[in-house]
Amino acid sequence: MSQYDNVSVVKKANVYFDGKCVSHTVVLADGTKKTVGVILPSSLTFNTGAPEIMEGVGGSCRVKLKGESEWKTYGDGQSFNVPGNSSFEIACDEPYHYVCHFG
């Protein structure tokens, strides 16, 4: 799916790491919340509250989940799962566009 129809968008952006990650929250008709964003070239560490599925929709990244020793590469059309109350490191050499699915 290349777009979401019939959604509400929170106008104010979520800006993290001095602008290296910017996203917008979208709310689907059924109340489901997602964020749609971009991570600019950088190496960042994110903490999670709820479980997340990160769906890549453009670019690529390397990811290391908390407790793992190896980095894995993900690109356009690929997803990775992050447990709740955890963290992950992400490294991008190019803009990485994503949709974050919660729960």
Curated annotation (Swiss-Prot):
InterPro entries listed in its UniProt record: Ppnp (IPR009664), RmlC-like_jellyroll (IPR014710), RmlC_Cupin_sf (IPR011051)
GO molecular function, one term: uridine phosphorylase activity
Domain of life from the UniProt record: Bacteria
Cystine residue pairs: none
Keywords: Glycosyltransferase, Transferase
Transmembrane segments: none
Gene coding for it: ppnP
Annotated signal sequence range: none
Function of the protein: Catalyzes the phosphorolysis of diverse nucleosides, yielding D-ribose 1-phosphate and the respective free bases. Can use uridine, adenosine, guanosine, cytidine, thymidine, inosine and xanthosine as substrates. Also catalyzes the reverse reactions.
EC number: 2.4.2.1, 2.4.2.2
Reaction it catalyzes: a purine D-ribonucleoside + phosphate = a purine nucleobase + alpha-D-ribose 1-phosphate; adenosine + phosphate = alpha-D-ribose 1-phosphate + adenine; cytidine + phosphate = cytosine + alpha-D-ribose 1-phosphate; guanosine + phosphate = alpha-D-ribose 1-phosphate + guanine
Protein name: Pyrimidine/purine nucleoside phosphorylase
Pfam family, one: Ppnp
Species per Swiss-Prot/TrEMBL record: Dechloromonas aromatica (strain RCB)
GO cellular component labels: cytosol
Family, per entry: Belongs to the nucleoside phosphorylase PpnP family.
